[in-house]
């Protein structure tokens, strides 16, 4: 069965909440031409209801506003209206304090919510999902009551996402300690965000809540028992979060081992409902039972994720982590590089000092680290539960 072609025959109606903010704008940009999803409703603050999107929004992305979005009306959020339009999937770019109330209500009304908000990330039955890192966590939606009920799936904090993508292939080496300093762009603070007087020609050495998020989320996503030490700084850059990372491992490791792990890992989703036979794994990873048990990774060396029509989900690159072999790279101005744009994590300056491995990484905080991550999560859901989504019957 050709999943991609079947889904494309009839696009799936979706809605975006918080559509006027920076992350909301990225959602609209990604969904306007998406091969699987039809943008059917957008919502902003109450004061903007029934107003035309193009007239109301200060567009801040480095790409033009999609014409299909420009003339859409911002609408109030009503459950009956969503149901009447056949909308089941909702992308949430709501502030955490609003999402804490709205998203559980949508779940109770049988909607499938893919959220960028942090409000529900730490609930035990709500996954923090990164398809190429922990796809097996999608099954948490069944703990929330799916298919009888709706669910909420979250993506990680933007800085966490980039680091988790880089560390995912390295779990087999048994990470003992993680030291990370982040240099985060102003777009991560939203719009209008920080005052120019605060940030221009300056750096702010503390971002409230950010360091705790990285610690908690990395441990949940990667199932790490490692000690994590994070320091987060805001810098006067528009897009892209740069991170410097030092790792200490349980066993001796060389930089060539790190490179091989990054280069050999591709995301190849399994067929519908067989996803949980394995996590995303490297094709050169053949662990012994002891190593697999210790790292929390699959012990069956043949349980590799198979190809879907020669490529991955529409929003995911075949190679999620790309190493740049030049001492001056990566840089934040490259955050929209790659294909799909903004969805690759770039690493560089890989080196060994004593018993520690160091490297630099760059993640696009708005695409990979926010809206693009949520869209990829929805794609993984559609692919995994395709039979149910088309027939309403569990396979």
Located regions from the model:
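N-terminal Rossmann-like NAD(P) cofactor-binding subdomain of oxidoreductases
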Residues: 2-200, 227, 273, 284-298, ...
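Charged docking surfaces used in two-component/phosphorelay signaling
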Residues: 187-395
